[in-house]
C-alpha cells in the first residue's frame, strides 16, 4: 500500500492550468466537475477539492462532498487534505533553495560528498560513488518501494533511515530504471534538515508556506486534528470505505519524505501559481551576503 493510494483515497486534488476566466465557460467547467464527481468519484472519495489557475490568478476553486461520512459536514476550499506524493515537490524545492545558499553545491553534488561516506550503498559501488540528490528526486536509484518500513519504529529521521537504506539491495539498474521509492526520498529530508539546521516542518513552513501565503497548510507530524478544518482519510477495501486513524497517518508520515503535507484548495492554488512561474516569493531576491561555503561538518559520516 503506497502513500499515494492511502492518502489519495480521501481526496482527488486537481491542480489544472485551464484557459477560462468567468462567464458561461467557467460555469460549464464547474458543472462538469460536479457531474464527474457525482457520477464517478462520490463512492470512492467522500470529499474532493479542485483548483484552477491561469496567468497568476485563481480562476476557480471548488469543494465537493463531505469531510467525513459520519458527520456529513460539508468541506470548503479551506479544508485540509493529505496530499500524499505531492509532498515530494516541497522536499525538492527545499533542497534547491538550500543548495543555492552554499557555494559549490547543487542537485548533482554526490551523496558520497554530502555524507562523507564512500560506502553509502553497501550493495552497490556504483551508487555509492555517483548517486546524487537528483537521482533520489527522479527515482532512478533502482530500489523497489518498501513503504511498510515507515511503520518500523527503528527507522527514524537522520542516520537510522540512512543506515536502513544503505543495506537495501537494488532491484533495477542505476539511472537506467524507474522504481518509485518513498523511503529513499527521506534522504532528501535528512539533507534539508542538516543544511537548514532545523526540522523539515519548520523549514518548509518558514521558507515555502509563509512566503507564498499558504497560511492554512500544515503537517501530519505536528498537527492536532481537533483544532483545524481537516478531511478524514478513507481507504477502499472490498468495495467499502473505511476511515484511516489519524495516529496511523501521523506515524506513516513521520519521515516527511513523500507523505507529510496537508493543504487546501486555496493554498494549493498559490503553490501552483508559483510552480507555473506566476508568483515570485521573497526567496527569489538576490542573496546579499553571497552563498556560504559548503562543509562536510553538516554531514557526519554514518
UniProtKB/Swiss-Prot annotation:
The keyword Transmembrane helix applies. It is found in: Membrane. Component of the organic matrix of calcified shell layers. This is Gigasin-6. Keywords: Membrane, Signal, Transmembrane, Transmembrane helix. The chain crosses the membrane at residues 75-95. It is a single-pass membrane protein. Residues 1-22 form the signal peptide. InterPro entries: Bact_CellWall_Synth/Modif, Beta-lactam-related, Beta-lactam/transpept-like. Gene3D superfamilies: DD-peptidase/beta-lactamase superfamily. GO terms for cellular component: membrane.
Amino acid at each position: 500500500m503506497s502513500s499515494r493510494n492511502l492518502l489519495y483515497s480521501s481526496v482527488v486534488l486537481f491542480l489544472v492550468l485551464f484557459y477560462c476566466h468567468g462567464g458561461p465557460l467557467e460555469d460549464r467547467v464547474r458543472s462538469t466537475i460536479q457531474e464527474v464527481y457525482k457520477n464517478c468519484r462520490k463512492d470512492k472519495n467522500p470529499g474532493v477539492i479542485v483548483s484552477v489557475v491561469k496567468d497568476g490568478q485563481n480562476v476557480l476553486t471548488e469543494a465537493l462532498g463531505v469531510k467525513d461520512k459520519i458527520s456529513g459536514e460539508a468541506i470548503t476550499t479551506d479544508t485540509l487534505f493529505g496530499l500524499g506524493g505531492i509532498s515530494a515537490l516541497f522536499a525538492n524545492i527545499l533542497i534547491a533553495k538550500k543548495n543555492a545558499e552554499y557555494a559549490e553545491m547543487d542537485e548533482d553534488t554526490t551523496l558520497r560528498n554530502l555524507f562523507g561516506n564512500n560506502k553509502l550503498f553497501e550493495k552497490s559501488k556504483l551508487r555509492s560513488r555517483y548517486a546524487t540528490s537528483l537521482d533520489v528526486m527522479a527515482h532512478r536509484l533502482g530500489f523497489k518501494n518498501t513503504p511498510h518500513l515507515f511503520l518500523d519504529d527503528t527507522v527514524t529521521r537522520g542516520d537510522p533511515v540512512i543506515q536502513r537504506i544503505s543495506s537495501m539491495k537494488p532491484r533495477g539498474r542505476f539511472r537506467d530504471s524507474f522504481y518509485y521509492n518513498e523511503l529513499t526520498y527521506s534522504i532528501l529530508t535528512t539533507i534539508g534538515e542538516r543544511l537548514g539546521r532545523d526540522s523539515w516542518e519548520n523549514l518548509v513552513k518558514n521558507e515555502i508556506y509563509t512566503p507564498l501565503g499558504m497560511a492554512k497548510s500544515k503537517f501530519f507530524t505536528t498537527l492536532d486534528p481537533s483544532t483545524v478544518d481537516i478531511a478524514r482519510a478513507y481507504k477502499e477495501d472490498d468495495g467499502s470505505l473505511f476511515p484511516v486513524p489519524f495516529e496511523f497517518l501521523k506515524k506513516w508520515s513521520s519521515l516527511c519524505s513523500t507523505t507529510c503535507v496537508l493543504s487546501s484548495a486555496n493554498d494549493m492554488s498559490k503553490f501552483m501559481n508559483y510552480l507555473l512561474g506566476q508568483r515570485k516569493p521573497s526567496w527569489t531576491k538576490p542573496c546579499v551576503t553571497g552563498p556560504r561555503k559548503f562543509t562536510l561538518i553538516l554531514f557526519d559520516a554514518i
